[in-house]
Design a protein with these regions (language model features):
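Terminal, charged accessory segments of proteins
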Residues: 1-196
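Intrinsically disordered, low-complexity regions enriched in small/polar residues
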Residues: 14, 109-115, 203, 219-222, ...
Length: 280
């Protein structure tokens, strides 16, 4: 089954958020700060979160964003590419991630890594370019248009420049760590496919997301106890041009109501962590 929906407006009540630690902007270091915090100076304060991968299904980044939603001005820092080494993964940011952040009025800083440590045939503990992230925060501090406008402008005017920085930084990391990374041609291909037009980025990302949805649809987790075999596709479109290709483990149909049931499991705990469920 493919359940199709459209978001025409958004309202929500934020529950179960964590208290945000206050960090003075003069002491800011994106690599040392908590995954979500409240950044303050003498005049302004805003919430900031950071992702450790551009891939939405790793490390539960949506929980980090969720914890900032009750603050009026929200920023999230996302690496546009993360290369873990030739024997590991390389993930790229997707259009619909940006679209969802825009829908939630979250400013996105598209960031890149400049340092890392060697761990066998991979690299770990990758560090953002703090000066770059800080400069973007200062820009947003003075920015008075919407997060949507900021995010689209950054995609249109700055994304190619950041990809060039990614290439340079990963070449340096490969040299200093001695770990062979993925071929840089993949970065050039990404740059070419997204072009300088948001619509090209959207189409490229959407094709990958739809394929991922199809793969997930036929995948079953043996550790998740399900009462039915009613796994379904869920395709949602929003009024900002976002389209989300999702799956749900079970559905329950009762008259005019469709219940979406998501199964989760934990290796050691009695129940999965609450962070897994905040953004479901």
């Amino acid at each position: 089954m493919n359940i199709v929906g459209k978001i025409t407006g958004i309202t929500y009540k934020v529950l179960l958020t964590e208290d945000l630690k206050k960090v003075e902007i003069k002491n800011f270091d994106i690599n040392q700060m908590p995954s979500s915090c409240l950044l303050t100076d003498n005049k302004n304060s805003f919430a900031i979160s950071k992702w450790v991968s551009p891939k939405r299904t790793r490390s539960y980044p949506f929980e980090r964003v969720f914890n900032t939603l009750n603050i009026s001005k929200k920023i999230t820092v996302i690496p546009i590419v993360k290369d873990e080494g030739g024997k590991g993964d390389r993930d790229f940011i997707q259009w619909d991630t940006v679209s969802l952040m825009s829908l939630l009025d979250v400013f996105v800083i598209f960031a890149y890594y400049t340092e890392a440590e060697k761990a066998d045939l991979k690299i770990i503990n990758q560090q953002f370019d703090n000066k770059y992230v800080y400069s973007k925060i200062k820009e947003i501090e003075q920015y008075h248009s919407s997060a949507l406008h900021w995010n689209l402008n950054e995609l249109n005017t700055n994304l190619h420049n950041i990809i060039d920085k990614v290439k340079t930084s990963y070449a340096d990391i490969e040299k200093t760590t001695g770990v062979k990374l993925h071929n840089a041609n993949g970065l050039d291909n990404f740059k070419d496919k997204i072009g300088k037009d948001v619509s090209l980025f959207m189409a490229f990302s959407r094709g990958k997301a739809e394929k991922a949805q199809s793969r997930e649809f036929v995948t079953f987790q043996p550790k998740e106890s399900l009462s039915t075999l009613s796994k379904a596709k869920v395709t949602i479109t929003n009024y900002l041009g976002g389209q989300y290709f999702l799956t749900v483990d079970e559905i329950l149909l009762t008259k005019d109501k469709v219940s979406l049931i998501e199964g989760k499991h934990s290796k050691n705990a009695i129940l999965p962590r609450i962070s897994i469920n905040k953004f479901l």
